[in-house]
């Protein structure tokens, strides 16, 4: 069940969050104007965090559902202390480096949560990587194509729309073409409603 939930999470969160990272520049410029342009890399880093955050939450829920609230508490306290140390160390370098350090630490800490879940239910890292890698690679390929198609447009609104439309069409088309089980189940669920 966990592996299916991880696949579903990757199927949804990777295109949405990495897609937001792709349109971050246009989104910031359109919504809050040029003066906020330095925030674009911060938003992109937070999108990377957001792509993997739901997977981490699944691991945390495994720990809690097995009655290991002590592990949950200790892991969160240790990570909180690590965040404070990173904040202090990165303070002289500015907020961008603070966010980058946080995202990197979070991704590394995801492995800690995986170790706890693996100990409790026997899920292997190899299987998790095998489950999420296709969605990750398809998402990166789709977004690369969308970036390339939109690259030649000088109009920010057209570029923004092209990135979203091309990404959505390609992602759905590829999922349909490779006969993704998760995709078919989602479509089936939506049609039943």
Cite the ranges covered by each PLM segment.
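Membrane-proximal transmembrane or re-entrant/amphipathic helices at the cytosolic face
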Residues: 118-125, 132, 147-193
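Specific pore-lining/lateral-gate transmembrane helices of multi-pass inner-membrane transport
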Residues: 1-77
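Short helix-capping/hinge motifs at transmembrane helix termini and TM-loop junctions
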Residues: 23-28, 32-36, 67-68, 90-95, ...
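Short alpha-helical transmembrane segments in multi-pass integral membrane proteins
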Residues: 8-17, 76-80, 96-118, 164-168
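Alpha-helical transmembrane segments of multi-pass membrane proteins
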Residues: 3-12, 79, 126, 130, ...
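Residue-level signature of transmembrane alpha-helical entry/exit and packing/kink sites
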Residues: 38-42, 94, 98, 127, ...
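Hydrophobic alpha-helical transmembrane segments in multi-pass integral membrane proteins
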Residues: 84-88, 139-154
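Alpha-helical transmembrane segments of multi-pass membrane transporters/permeases
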Residues: 59-88, 96-99, 131-132
């Amino acid at each position: 069940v966990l592996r299916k939930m991880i696949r579903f999470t990757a199927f949804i969160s990777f295109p949405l969050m990495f897609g937001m990272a792709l349109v971050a520049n246009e989104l910031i410029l359109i919504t809050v104007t040029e003066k906020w342009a330095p925030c674009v890399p911060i938003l992109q880093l937070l999108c990377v965090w957001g792509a993997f955050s739901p997977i981490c939450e699944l691991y945390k829920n495994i720990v809690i559902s097995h009655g290991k609230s002590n592990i949950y508490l200790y892991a969160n306290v240790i990570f909180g202390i690590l965040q404070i140390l990173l904040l202090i160390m990165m303070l002289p370098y500015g907020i961008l480096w603070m966010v980058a350090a946080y995202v990197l630490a979070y991704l590394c800490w995801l492995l800690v949560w995986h170790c706890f879940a693996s100990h409790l239910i026997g899920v292997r890292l190899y299987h998790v990587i095998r489950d999420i890698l296709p969605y990750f690679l398809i998402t990166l390929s789709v977004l690369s194509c969308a970036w390339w198609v939109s690259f030649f447009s000088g109009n920010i609104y057209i570029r923004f729309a092209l990135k979203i439309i091309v990404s959505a069409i390609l992602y759905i088309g590829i999922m349909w073409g490779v006969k993704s089980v998760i995709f078919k189940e989602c479509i089936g669920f939506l049609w039943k409603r």
